[in-house]
Structures are given as C-alpha cells and as structure tokens.
Amino acid sequence: LNYGEDWSSRLKNARKLSKNELKDLSLEYGNFIGHKLVLFLKGKEKPDLISSHGHTVFHQPEQGITLQIGDLNQIASVSGITTVGDFRSFDVSKGGQGAPLVPIGDEMLFSEYDYCVNLGGISNYSRVVNGERKAKDIAPCNIVSNLLSIKLGAEFDENGEFGRNGKIQKDLLNKLSQWPYYLSGKSLGIENLEDSFIPILDIYSCVVEDKLRTYYEHISQVIGSHLAGKTNKALFTGGGVKNSFLMNCIQKYSDCNIIIPADEVIEFKEAIIFGLLGYLRINNKINVLSSVTGASSDSSSGSIVYA
C-alpha cells in the first residue's frame, strides 16, 4: 500500500497533534484503512478477520503509555469484517514493555531457527534460552539509514551503495557505541532515537556517506555480537535484508549461518505473524509472551470489534 506524501507526512507528524486532533486522525486513518481493504479484497475470498497493528504514535511503557492509531471501529464498519487490534496496551498494563510481539510467531511458525532476526526500522531478534523464548530490540536500523539517505536525495540506501562509498569515522563509531540505551535492556522507540541517537550523527562533522558507512559498521557490530555459534542458524527478515552491503557487514561480526529466505517471507513475515496474533486473540489463546515483554504473565491481548 502506497500511502502517498500526504498520509506519510500526517502519520510522521502525529506526535505533534493535540489530544482531540489525534482522535480525529485515528478515526480518519481507520476509515482510510477500511476503504483500502475493501479495494484490495475485491474479487478475493472474504477473510474471517482483520488483524491491524495500527500506526504507533507513542510508545513509553515505563510510563504505562503505548498508542497505536487507526480506529478499529472504523475498519470493521467500513470493511464489514471483524477486526482485532491494540495488541500492546494490555501487556503494558501488566508491567510489560508491550514489545516485542513477533516472538510468539517465531515460536509457533519458525522454531527450526536458532535466531529470528528482523531488520526493520529497528533491529530485533528472538531465540530460545533454557527452554524459554527470549527477545529484545538490538539497535536502530532502517529508520536512521533512511533519514540519512533522504539527505542524499533518496528514500533509502539501495543495496547500501551510499554507505559503501563512505569511510568509517572512528571517533563517530566510538560515540555511537557508547549510546546509553545499550545498557538499559528496554524496548526501543522512535522517541529514544530522536532524543539521543540521531543527534550524535547530526552534530558530527563529515559527509553523509561517511555517516552511513560508520552507522552500518556500528549496527553490524551490535547485531553481530548477539549472534554466536557456527552451527546455529539465524533467519533474517525485514527490509534491511535487501541492503546487501549491510548484510555483508553483519556477517563479518557473526559466525552464525545466516539464512535469507524467499522474498515473500522477507517482506511479509511480520504481517503473517500479526495475522496469527489476531487469530489467537479471537480464540482467547495466549498471543503475548511475558518472557519477552517482562509483563507479570502471558496474555491474550488485543481489542476485538465484531462486524
């Protein structure tokens, strides 16, 4: 789905809106999603349910706050299909981080891999430790490289070519490596990046290509440090997998057997798993694991709007 410049801008700037303006945007966005789904489903078999993550505006679990907009009532009303969403709030109310949510899918659908790594806006992974699924956000990923690429006139760094042509700035690399988040063990949101990570890159004086090259080296070191074992298999998915230069950098810092699956899995693994979350919720089965979120217990999380 191509949002176009208008919706991309409105969602990006949603954090700046007042409470009432945010409510209005959520209603309008839900209506937009509903109509897009109707168009998408023309000529196709009607699904049993819609599972919607929504657009995250705020995620501050330490303060008990997580907000994803895209009104579920609007989606269900316009589409005529039962809709499930708001998967994070209940976990946060139980003292959890409300993230990550994907590990339940890793456990049920991709358990043959020792690590399941996602290179999305933020990189994260899950694995089994002593019989229990564990997961965490690792480091920034595409959010930051996309922002740097925009300064070079592109929406993203295709195949990592901008970074490939840059040089590592050792002082900048050291500054990025000292980012305090890495000691916190908490989930990572755009707020953390805007407040303290992106400014490190912004104030450093060098060409953008050098910033990208240094950034790739940095996140490769951090990601690689989490993946060990020559006999272990690490499944990589998410948009960052298509950045061949970044993948080569990561391989330098990990001795794991890195597995890159078919394009359908790379692009749609999270969508598939969110469909699973909705299925589990509507059947009142556990869909959020406290072992990865830190909540007081596992839960069947999410709001349901029956059409």
Indicate where each model-derived feature is located.
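Conserved ATP-utilizing enzyme core subdomain
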Residues: 1, 131-220, 283-284, 293-307
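Glycine-rich phosphate-binding loop plus the immediately following alpha-helix
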Residues: 1-13, 78-80, 84-109, 115-182
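Short beta-strand-loop/turn "lid" adjacent to the catalytic site in phosphate-handling enzymes
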Residues: 18-72
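Phosphate/ATP-binding catalytic cores across multiple sugar-kinase/actin-like superfamilies
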Residues: 33-40, 208-232, 281
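Conserved acidic residues
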Residues: 47-48, 114, 232-234
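Glycine-rich phosphate-binding loops at beta-strand->alpha-helix junctions
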Residues: 57, 232-251
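A glycine- and small-aliphatic-rich helix-loop capping segment at beta-alpha/alpha-beta transitions
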Residues: 63-74, 106-109, 129-133, 249-256
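Conserved phosphate-binding/catalytic loops in two-lobed NTP-binding clefts
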Residues: 251-273
